[in-house]
Amino acid sequence: MIAIFLFYNKTNGFQSIFSTKGIKHCNIICYDGQDFVIFGLEEHGISFRRIKAKSTLKIMRNIKVIESLIGMIVVHVDEPKKITWKPFWVRSCNELCRYFSGVDIGFTFNPYHLIKKLLKYNNKRNYQVLSVWSRNNGI
């Protein structure tokens, strides 16, 4: 599975008070071989939408026009880790991204912590980082 982690410098959620380094929010696009689906934490719950695109490269190129997007990490997940859903434990954007992708990195406190763990455990767990992009050294 391909997972594209997207990081933003704007949000309207209260969890942003725990964010650091100007990285306030994240969401994820997953590709399972048939469909691209974007998942995100919205004000009133979890949202997901199918994206019609011919390739991961097209999505990466076109999504960069979003002004608040400051970084992107693309990973290939070999075998998604089965993570027990704990809805009352944490409902943050970074944890939802971790759940949906199946990356084996353990708990993440905020989007910045998610970035650090994705880069730290590259090729050491169940995924490989394929690409890292940032706007003005965003990540």
What positions do the PLM features span?
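Cysteine-nucleophile amide-bond enzymes
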Residues: M1-I139
